[in-house]
Amino acid sequence: MVASRAIGSLRRFTASQTLRCPGYICRNFTRSSALLTRTHINYGVKGDVAVIRINSPNSKVNTLGQELHSEFIEVMNEVWSSSQIRSAVLISSKPGCFIAGADINMLSACTTSQEVTQISQEAQRTFEKLEKSTKPIVAAINGTCLGGGLELAISCQYRIATKDKKTVLGAPEVLLGILPGAGGTQRLPKMVGVPAAFDMMLTGRGIRADKAKKMGLVDQLVEPLGPGLKPPEERTIEYLEEVAVTFAKGLADKKISPKRDKGLVEKLTSYAMSIPFVRQQIYKKVEEKVRKQTKGLYPAPLKIIDVVKTGIEQGSDAGYLSESQKFGELAMTKESKALMGLYRGQTLCKKNKFGAPQKEVKHLAILGAGLMGAGIAQVSVDKHLKTILKDASLPALGRGQQQVFKGLNDKVRKKALTSFERDSLFSNLTGQLDYQGFEKADMVIEAVFEELSLKHKVLKEVEAVIPDHCVFASNTSALPISEIAAVSKRPEKVIGMHYFSPVDKMQLLEIITTEKTSKDSTASAVEVGLKQGKVIIVVKDGPGFYTTRCLAPMMSEVLRILQEGVGPKKLDSLTTSFGFPVGAATLMDEVGMDVAKHVAENLGKIFGERFAGGNLDVLKQMISKGFLGRKSGKGFYVYQEGVKNRNVNSDTESILASLKIPSRPDISSDEDIQYRLVTRFVNEAVLCLQEGILATPAEGDIGAVFGLGFPPCLGGPFRFVDLYGAQKVVDRLRKYEAIYGKQFTPCQLLIDHASSPNKKFFQ
């Protein structure tokens, strides 16, 4: 679902030229304009098997766009019309990617649902021809096979896949707010059964090749090859092609049957699905679960259920028509535009726009073996980075090392790693109490307590032992990097790398640069973050940077709303029903009252009244009683091991009651409470762009969604302003400003967008 890049190029032939390659039984290629202009696909013939190679130019992946689709139709028509060809193999020339899905830019360019429906119907017709082909077609899958790529593969008569970690099959369209639009909603249930098909399409979950084989999604597996005269990726593709050609010949000769024998469980499932009452119960249960999980905020899952149901109950023709129509409708929804915008932003934030650093970071050192330090260590050794984990305390160091091992061992339990791979990765970690080995470090990341004097102390100690090229990064969430760098002998090598907890699960990394930070230091930080698998935003230095600065005023409003008498459970319900993955009161417990108070006091001193809201005495009293949040077992809720339905902490309710403030009925409806929270967040985000803290709106959206849990269905604060309307946001702010003053005063950039309706953050 992203753009693509070529590894090879198409050869041109005159009418008399033939393709002569080892292992080929060749045929003549006539010169034609279609052949000469083909850039995404080329093919040759091995015996009587056409080997069709997909290799889109200028990208690491193949995507199904208009050009590739047109070329594919041309090639298949040649294959079907040739008497010398009895079968075909579809394979990608790109290592690690079969087809990553449809080109979402093609969908974004459409202005009506009818245009999108037409694209769907064209793809449906093409894949129907594949499905009904009298010449067997084998899909040889190596790497990602997603979305339209999967729909293409399941239209073929046979599928062979490499048993490699990079080979993943899936239908992730729901994550973009759409549904499989090239026949996937109709073929997938028939191939793997309705329950498994629903699971794939409603979650967007990727399926590994070995599991795909058990499900019936793949017919045969091929072991990847190791290094030889050629790189392992190249050897694997060549071997996969050889195996696929053999199976294609076997299918054409009727020596291999494309029909797979179903196991007992599959037979029982098929029988159960033949009973109307059972089917209706399954539809009902799945729909109930979807409504509960999505809270009605995402239309795509319910449409997927509807389309699958139509195909099963009314037949394939009705199913395909419903699929194409619903595909068109969904592509025009605000939710889909928001999710596609996030996808594009995520793609941009996975690139190093600062170029390659002068020296690759091969040796990493981390100061502090606490929750954050150990988390950073885990995502580093996990990616084969040699890592030193240092702490001043032996027990703390032991806990940190154990946390890293546990994280790796969890992957063994989930069969993502073998025990040998776990031990090999863990061997990249060295735990120590001193600075031995720091003279080889290419980067040091400090993750010590949020206290400026302590950070100054470790910075001075580190600079006494590290080499000149070494970058010093601070994992601070709010302390200005320029203040940390004030004691540095080399401020150009000091940078901020703000990770989010838990580090192994949170995708975002916020990198903070000062006026003195060099471009090379930034490039090094981005390179390390990308190795760790992070989505990266780069922001300028300032109090709270971007993420903490946006979250702080919203948390201040949370505190005020709680003081006004809205209970934690009610507030959580209001925020999750708006699209936040975690309720506001629960989020406070996750952050911790001590951290929340520390940030609120520091940023409050700097930003003044704009960051005011609830009374910090609430937090102070909670801290004094040990109610720090989840980490202490009590916060707004009481936390017990294994208990999902948490009770509200009655002692905290008493504190809130003692500090209760009157609510205003005109701004205290459920909707007003939701918008009081969201507008403070959005206004601060736009102000960060106005002040140059943020470089782009896209990075602002990515930071808010992946770091702070801003509702994905809204696309981030900037996409929200575009889709909801800047004027409506300003009107909301003015309404609350009349009561609370500067805390809700809209920033100038937001006012500018409101006064010019055509002015958008995303054109």
Swiss-Prot record:
Give all Omega-N-methylarginine modified positions. Answer: 399
Q: Which residues carry this modification: N6-acetyllysine?
A: 46, 60, 129, 166, 214, 249, 289, 295, 303, 326, 334, 350, 353, 406, 411, 460, 505, 519, 540, 569, 644, 728, 735, 759
Question: Which Pfam families does the protein's record reference?
Answer: 3HCDH, 3HCDH_N, ECH_1
Keywords (alphabetical) are:
Acetylation, Fatty acid metabolism, Lipid metabolism, Lyase, Membrane, Methylation, Mitochondrion, Mitochondrion inner membrane, Multifunctional enzyme, NAD, Oxidoreductase, Phosphoprotein, Transferase, Transit peptide
In the UniProt record, the transit peptide is located at 1-36
Q: Locate the Phosphoserine modifications and list their residues.
A: 316, 419, 650, 756
In which pathway is this protein known to take part? Lipid metabolism; fatty acid beta-oxidation
Q: Where is this site: Important for long-chain enoyl-CoA hydratase activity?
A: 151, 173
Superkingdom assignment? Eukaryota
Q: Please list the GO terms describing molecular function.
A: enoyl-CoA hydratase activity; long-chain fatty acyl-CoA hydrolase activity; long-chain-3-hydroxyacyl-CoA dehydrogenase activity; NAD+ binding; transferase activity
Question: Which organism does this sequence originate in?
Answer: Sus scrofa
> Could you tell me the Gene Ontology terms of the biological process aspect for this record?
cardiolipin acyl-chain remodeling; fatty acid beta-oxidation; response to insulin
Q: Which Gene3D superfamilies match?
A: 1.10.1040.50, 2-enoyl-CoA Hydratase, Chain A, domain 1, NAD(P)-binding Rossmann-like Domain
Reactions accelerated catalytically: a (3S)-3-hydroxyacyl-CoA = a (2E)-enoyl-CoA + H2O; a 4-saturated-(3S)-3-hydroxyacyl-CoA = a (3E)-enoyl-CoA + H2O; (3S)-hydroxyoctanoyl-CoA = (2E)-octenoyl-CoA + H2O; (3S)-3-hydroxydodecanoyl-CoA = (2E)-dodecenoyl-CoA + H2O
The yes or no answer to whether the keyword Calcium is present is no
Q: Give the Enzyme Commission number.
A: 2.3.1.-, 4.2.1.17, 1.1.1.211
Q: How does it assemble?
A: Heterotetramer of 2 alpha/HADHA and 2 beta/HADHB subunits; forms the mitochondrial trifunctional enzyme. Also purified as higher order heterooligomers including a 4 alpha/HADHA and 4 beta/HADHB heterooligomer which physiological significance remains unclear. The mitochondrial trifunctional enzyme interacts with MTLN.
Q: What does this protein do?
A: Mitochondrial trifunctional enzyme catalyzes the last three of the four reactions of the mitochondrial beta-oxidation pathway. The mitochondrial beta-oxidation pathway is the major energy-producing process in tissues and is performed through four consecutive reactions breaking down fatty acids into acetyl-CoA. Among the enzymes involved in this pathway, the trifunctional enzyme exhibits specificity for long-chain fatty acids.
Question: What family is it from?
Answer: In the N-terminal section; belongs to the enoyl-CoA hydratase/isomerase family.
Q: Where is this site: Important for hydroxyacyl-coenzyme A dehydrogenase activity?
A: 498
Q: Which residues carry this modification: N6-succinyllysine?
A: 46, 60, 166, 213-214, 230, 249, 303, 326, 334, 350, 406, 411, 415, 440, 460, 505, 519, 569, 620, 634, 644, 728, 759
Question: Under which name does UniProt file this protein?
Answer: Trifunctional enzyme subunit alpha, mitochondrial
- What residues sit in the active site? 510 (for hydroxyacyl-coenzyme a dehydrogenase activity)
Q: Which residues form the signal peptide?
A: none
Matching InterPro entries: 3-OHacyl-CoA_DH_CS, 3-OHacyl-CoA_DH_NAD-bd, 3HC_DH_C, 6-PGluconate_DH-like_C_sf, ClpP/crotonase-like_dom_sf, Enoyl-CoA_hyd/isom_CS, Enoyl-CoA_hydra/iso, Fa_ox_alpha_mit
